[in-house]
Design a protein with these regions (language model features):
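ATP-dependent helicase/translocase motor core
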Residues: 1-217, 226-242, 259-262, 269, ...
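Short, conserved "post-DEAD/DEAH" coupling segment immediately C-terminal to helicase motif II
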Residues: 80-84, 301-319, 546
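Conserved RecA-like ASCE ATPase "motif II neighborhood" in helicase/translocase motors
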Residues: 263-296, 301-310, 493-499, 512-514
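Conserved segment of the helicase C-terminal RecA-like domain
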Residues: 545-576
Length: 578
């Protein structure tokens, strides 16, 4: 609908017609009309309440109920319309609005089965909900705004053939960053809590910036510890082949030479290598004097801070836009003392965990604290915990054995009889190996795997074997469990397959140290076992692996802490709920 439509005329010639004006700042030039009580006859006769026509096409459908009646009835009515009579021109409907006067929500017209979970309240920029129909109409339905929503903020999921409309906080974030890009050369960042759809927001920003002639290149940077394969899959869901993942620094440079590649997704580390290596200087020099935008995913990561100065030298006109669910403040500053604001300057929009829980976009947490050391030690006292926080105590055979027994005892109840699954994060590779071997002794029917990165040279962390050998053992067990043929030489493929198995609940428990604790989304993951000390952003990021919305069978994310104490949890929640 947004592109030119070819129409064959009576004389056989072809004319191209623009059905909808999508040009910047020309949205208001579309023609708007309102019609009431349109009757459509399909399998049954249905009468639609209010239809907004734009250039003669029914693009917005509004269904109303009387005050006091649950407005979900209007949603159910839309479902009936789609089944029985919403055809012909009404297939062009982009947005549905439902209201009982007091509560009002909007949602996209999807070919997929509709779910009330994906209906949204509109808000102001400060996340204050606009419930009342009159106020909603004043804010959401002005000609320019509704046209902009349809032309800019609808996204087609090419994989699932699903039409999506962006949520208000996503809209405001992109609008603010676009304004920042077009009107200034200054940096900025967005603080949207984990699980709130930052990938979609950053994709839309990348897409819109890439169409601007003033922007020579958009780089989307992720950390190699995160699931860059997951990110690229999501990007290409939203627009097929919009972005290619760079496999090496040479591939990155080749893409930078290709002027048709306006969006390049790569890792922070590959970009850092490109900037360091003199042999790539001639390609990087091509961007001198040109406006380049770097969009940094999970920008609280210290790695970007370390390479920021180098990139700044190589790309003097670059702007940096960061996305994070857990910014760095003075309390959790990076090792060099810098905060997120020190690098990215201005916070242009926030949507906090308390907002997301209130809106039903993510779940809350149910946290258990399990004493595993000594009843004479006050687990709430940080100083005493530090005093006993030694490898010898924490790696004690009996302690590990007791925790494994406890996990096996509670796992079925925590995961709703294995409808869901769990990640078990521990403090070190030696501890992970010890847990893996302890689980294996039990001959449990739980499907358990382990994953970690190994170093080429190690300082005798393990007395009996190099960690790579231990990982090789785990992969061998995994191969037998799932009839695969991975090894440490094909670690990337193993990593990808483990990711899929967790998402599909084919694994019951995945043992990790740091992997999978940031950027990994799996709706069927509902439990996190924690035998390490977490705080601040690391705590919120790890806990948030469990809080993706699924069904009523998943009311919250389960957290079972064997070291992290209540004060650390309370402090982290307070810090990121300001």
């Amino acid at each position: 609908m947004k592109s030119l439509q070819d129409i064959t005329m009576d004389d056989g010639s072809t004319q191209y017609v623009e059905l909808f004006n999508t040009k910047n700042n020309e949205w208001c030039k579309n023609e708007f009309q309102i019609t009431h009580q349109v009757t459509m006859i399909g399998k049954y006769e249905n009468r639609y309440d209010v239809t907004l026509l734009i250039n003669g096409l029914p693009l917005v459908q509004i269904e109303l109920k009387r005050r006091g009646i649950d407005f979900k009835e209007a949603f159910n009515q839309v479902i009936r319309y789609k089944k029985h009579s919403l055809n012909d021109l009404f297939r062009y409907v982009q947005i549905f609005i439902i209201s009982n006067g007091i509560d009002t929500k909007y949602f996209a017209n999807s070919d997929k089965e509709m779910d009330f979970q994906y209906t949204f309240y509109w808000t102001d920029k400060n996340n204050n909900r606009i419930d009342n129909l009159y106020d909603f109409a004043l804010d959401f339905l002005p000609k320019c705004h509704i046209s902009k929503m349809i032309s800019r903020y609808m996204v087609v999921d090419d994989t699932q053939k699903n039409l999506m409309v962006m949520r208000p906080y996503q809209y405001y974030a992109v609008e603010e960053l676009m304004k920042r890009a077009y009107e200034t050369n200054n940096n900025a960042y967005v603080w949207h809590t984990t699980g709130s759809g930052k990938t979609l927001t950053s994709f839309k920003l990348s897409q819109l910036l890439s169409t601007n002639r003033e922007v020579a290149q958009v780089f989307f940077l992720v950390d190699r510890k995160d699931l860059d394969s997951q990110t690229i899959e999501e990007f290409n869901r939203f627009q097929k082949d919009t972005v290619d993942m760079t496999d090496s620094t040479d591939t990155l440079i080749a893409q930078m030479k290709d002027s048709s590649k306006k969006i390049i997704l790569t890792t922070i580390q590959k970009m850092s290598n490109a900037c360091k290596n003199d042999k790539y200087q001639d390609v990087i020099d091509r961007f001198e004097g040109k406006k380049v935008v770097f969009i940094i995913d999970e920008c609280h990561r210290s790695q970007f801070g370390e390479m920021h100065k180098m990139i700044k030298k190589k790309f003097p006109r670059a702007q940096y836009f960061g996305f994070t669910g857990t910014p760095r403040f003075a309390e959790n500053a990076s090792q060099d003392g810098r905060t997120t604001a020190d690098i990215f300057e201005k916070l242009v929009h926030h949507y906090l965990i308390k907002n997301a829980i209130a809106d039903g976009n993510v779940l809350g947490f149910n946290v258990d604290y399990v004493r595993t050391i000594s009843s004479t030690v006050d687990i709430e006292d940080d100083e005493e915990v530090e005093a006993i926080d030694t490898e010898e105590v924490l790696m004690d055979d009996q302690r590990i054995s007791n925790i494994v027994d406890y996990v096996l005892k509670i796992h079925n109840s925590k995961t709703n009889n294995r409808r869901y699954n769990a990640i078990f994060t521990v403090r070190s590779i030696p501890m992970l190996i010890k847990y893996y071997d302890e689980f294996k002794k039990r001959n449990t029917d739980l499907k358990i795997a382990g994953i970690f990165t190994f170093g080429a040279n190690e300082d005798g962390e393990l007395e009996t074997e190099h960690s790579r050998d231990s990982l090789e053992r785990m992969i061998k067990d995994y191969n037998q469990m799932f009839d695969k043929n991975y090894s440490t030489n094909t670690f990337s493929a193993y990593f990808t397959d483990v990711s899929k198995k967790v998402k599909n609940t084919e694994l019951d428990i995945l043992l990790v140290v740091n992997m999978f604790l940031t950027g990994f989304d799996a709706k069927r993951l509902n439990t996190l076992y924690v035998d390490k000390r977490l705080k601040h952003h690391d705590l919120i990021q790890a806990f948030s692996r469990t809080n993706r919305i699924e069904t009523a069978n998943k009311p919250y994310g389960n957290i079972v802490c064997f070291q992290t104490n209540k004060k650390a949890v309370d402090d982290a929640v307070k810090l990121f709920s300001l």
